Each structure stands twice: as C-alpha cells, then as structure tokens.
Design a protein with these regions (language model features):
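Surface-exposed, charged secondary-structure patches
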Residues: 20, 68, 73-120, 137
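Bacterial N-terminal signal peptides that target proteins for export
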Residues: 1-9
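Hydrophobic pocket/interface hotspot
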Residues: 43, 55, 123
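Short, low-complexity, Pro/Ser/Thr/Gly-rich segments in the mature regions of secreted, periplasmic
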Residues: 124-137
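C-terminal motif of bacterial Sec signal peptides marking the signal peptidase cleavage site
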Residues: 15-18
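Short, well-ordered alpha-helical segments enriched in acidic and aromatic residues
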Residues: 49-67
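Bacterial Sec signal peptide processing site at the extreme N-terminus
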Residues: 21-33
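Short, aromatic-enriched amphipathic alpha-helices that serve as compact interaction elements
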Residues: 32-48
Length: 137
C-alpha cells in the first residue's frame, strides 16, 4: 500500500475531526494566512456536517484526489470512512507559512481534553483557492 494511503485513516481521522465549534483559529490570522487557515476550518466543517463530497470537491487539491483515484480509491468513499469520527476532535491552526503558490499550516489536534498530535498540512493555490495537497505529516 502506498504511504499516503497507509496513513490515510489516522491522518484523516485527525484532520476531519471536526470539533465542538470553539472559537475559530482562522480568526488569529489575516490576509492570505487567514485564507489558508480557513481551508482547515472548511475541512472541519465539512467533516462535522458529514459531507465527504464537499471535502473532495472544495478542500482537497485535484492532484490529491487523483492520487487516491490512481491507487484504486474513490475520494468520497475514503472521506466517508473517516467522517464518522468527526465529533470528538478540535483542530487549531497554530502557524501558517506561505511561499508563493504553496503554504504549510501547522495544526494541533486535540481529542476531548487531551492535547494531541501536531501535524503539518501542505496546500497549494488552485483556481484562486487554497486546497490541501497532503493529508498531514
């Protein structure tokens, strides 16, 4: 199994975790950095609303969707598998770096009251919007 697919359930369970809707971490940023953080917020919102099709069409970059497809997986099916666990997590964007048409968002995930995993998500500008090009690392 390819590395991106092997870690898919864990990474997406954290990424798609949704949250109990605390204050948005995107509000901590301005300009392009806020736009990047908003993409992470959109990931949470779509997961919490159980809308895997929105994640595939609005949040993930086309290249990532194609990578899933070329490995024999349907994006919507894969997102459906992990959005069932979207209630007990909180994602907090702690830092954003932008370099031209690419960006990295540092995200802290917490489950319940426990501090959790720090991970980085890479994004790229696609059709004027920031889209995830990775599922975290």
């Amino acid at each position: 199994m390819r590395p991106v697919l092997r870690s898919l359930p864990l990474l997406l369970a954290l990424a798609l975790a949704g949250c109990g809707q605390p204050a948005s971490s995107a509000s901590d940023f301005k300009g392009e950095k806020k736009d990047v953080a908003d993409t992470i917020e959109q990931l949470q919102s779509s997961a919490q609303s159980r809308k895997p099709e929105d994640i595939c069409s609005e949040v993930l970059a086309r290249g990532l969707v194609e990578k899933l497809k070329s490995a024999g997986h349907d994006c919507v099916d894969e997102m459906e598998k992990v959005t069932g666990d979207a209630d007990d997590f909180e994602l907090d964007v702690t830092a954003v770096t932008i370099s031209g048409a690419t960006a990295t968002a540092r995200v802290k995930a917490r489950k319940g009251g426990k501090d959790g995993v720090l991970t980085s998500y890479t994004l790229a500008r696609e059709d004027g919007k920031w889209r995830l090009t990775s599922l975290g690392s």
